[in-house]
Amino acid sequence: MRIARRKYGCILHHMSWILVGLGNPDKEYDGTRHNVGRDFVAHFKDKLSKKPKVLDLNVYMNNSGGPIKKAVPTKKAAQQLIVVHDELDLPLWRVKISFGSSAGGHNGIKSIEKALKTKDYVRVRVGISPSTPSGKLKRPDAEKITDFVLGKFKASEQEKLKKARKVVGEALELILTEGKERAMTEINSK
């Protein structure tokens, strides 16, 4: 734990951040939609101005909770956890930061919530679904979701993927330097 002094003279006590990107560890999953969180964290972990503790999970996404629980043993510590993951309910390139929200249908997030017994941690949700030219979400049909999330990004999606990576970098910097509330205000309005 460290102590930081703010310009208003109050002393803040806080623990350092823990950063994890969800994904599957095998090489065959590199570059897939489901591994976008893991891939983005690998890209940024050495580039951030403040260095969080980065957890490089060597388990499949749906079993992420156990290893994270070892690094985040209390509900209070969970508030300093940042999880970057794919999000079917957002169009590709869209990034949203949430805190204390439900897993929806994301099994990796469900595993974390079950292990930590809390939803109170930061999620950086990276949209992976296609959208119409007007920006309306085109979520894949239920029976096609597994193939979709385990599929690689198309060449035509690379520009939007670069945009998402840039926004995730901005989100992580804001969380680490100015806090989750400021990051949510800034990033969620994009």
Question: Where in this protein do the model-derived segments appear?
Answer:
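Nucleotide and nucleotide-moiety/phosphate-recognizing core
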Residues: 2-3, 8-100, 110-125, 131-147, ...
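Conserved TIR/SEFIR loop-to-helix hotspot centered on a Trp-containing motif
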Residues: 103
